[in-house]
Design a protein with these regions (language model features):
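Catalytic cores of phosphodiester-bond hydrolases, prominently lipid phosphodiesterases
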Residues: 1-262
Length: 263
């Protein structure tokens, strides 16, 4: 069962800039599949095909930055197969090479250098096996807060002590135990009550957890982003205007907004 109702192309067109991809060994040693939690429950196709979509999208959207979080399954894909998927898709030409030793580059410099694809991996073996250094180690860089949650549970914001992480990720989605194709799985998507989960609770969770951390929010992880309204609070968190908004709407209304002609 997928965690979104739309494919990668539509997600990017809709403004999604962070992609969480669960990778596992494919049918052959040179293949990498996107499955969650395994390919019996859900098979989302090949990593190469998804990376090709991302690469083609970046070709025509050169002022956008996309981030991919690679999460390895129990049956880990071989590092050589993952590298091959990046090379065969052409996505490797956009990848930011490794975590900067000091500060992260500005978005403007990344755009200018055409390094607009950032890739994190939780697999130390994959990070070590990559001679080009474009898989950034997830545990050393990303502070991922508590989650996921079950329905009715309180949103929490630990851990509270940042060590050296510079990227803040807040998981905001609900999971359940469910049976697919005769097998029972934990931490499966919960596609219910999304108007609430992806509505006011999204903004409440973000603001509450931001107040207890020393770094700004970089990513909110959500399932079924197209349900509810995560766009409006995301614009607010980024201090961006709403669609079709106008700066004149923020002027103080001391007088009627009319102009009289004097002859």
């Amino acid at each position: 069962m997928g965690t979104q109702y739309f494919g990668i192309q539509q997600q990017l067109n809709d403004g999604i800039r962070g992609l969480h991809l669960n990778i596992t060994q494919g049918a052959t040693a040179s293949d990498v599949s996107l499955c969650y939690p395994d390919c019996n429950a859900y098979n989302g196709g090949s990593l190469r095909d998804t990376l090709t979509i991302v690469k083609n999208w970046l070709d025509t959207n050169q002022r956008d930055v996309v981030t991919i979080f690679l999460e390895s399954a129990l049956l880990k894909a071989s590092p050589a197969a993952v590298l091959k998927a990046f090379a065969d898709s052409g996505a490797d030409k956009y990848v930011l090479m490794g975590k900067p030793a000091a500060a992260w580059p500005s978005l403007e410099s990344m755009i200018g250098n055409h390094t607009t694809l950032v890739v994190f991996s939780d697999d130390a073996g994959l990070v070590a096996a990559n001679p080009k250094g474009y898989f950034i180690p997830h545990p050393n860089t990303v502070l991922r807060l508590d989650g996921p949650f079950t329905y009715g549970a309180e949103w929490t914001c630990g851990p509270w002590n940042r060590r050296y992480e510079s990227i803040l990720v807040i998981p905001h989605y609900i999971v359940q135990t469910a049976t697919y194709n005769g097998a029972t799985y934990n931490n499966m998507p919960y596609p219910f009550n999304l108007g609430t989960t992806n509505g006011y609770q999204f903004e409440f969770h973000a603001i509450t957890c931001r107040g207890g951390q020393s770094i700004w929010i970089n990513f909110m992880e959500v399932d079924y982003y197209s349900e509810g309204d995560v766009k409006t609070p995301t614009l607010k968190l980024n201090a961006l205007p709403y669609p079709n908004d106008n700066v004149a709407n923020f002027y103080p209304q001391f007088f009627d907004a009319t102009v009289e002609v004097v002859g």
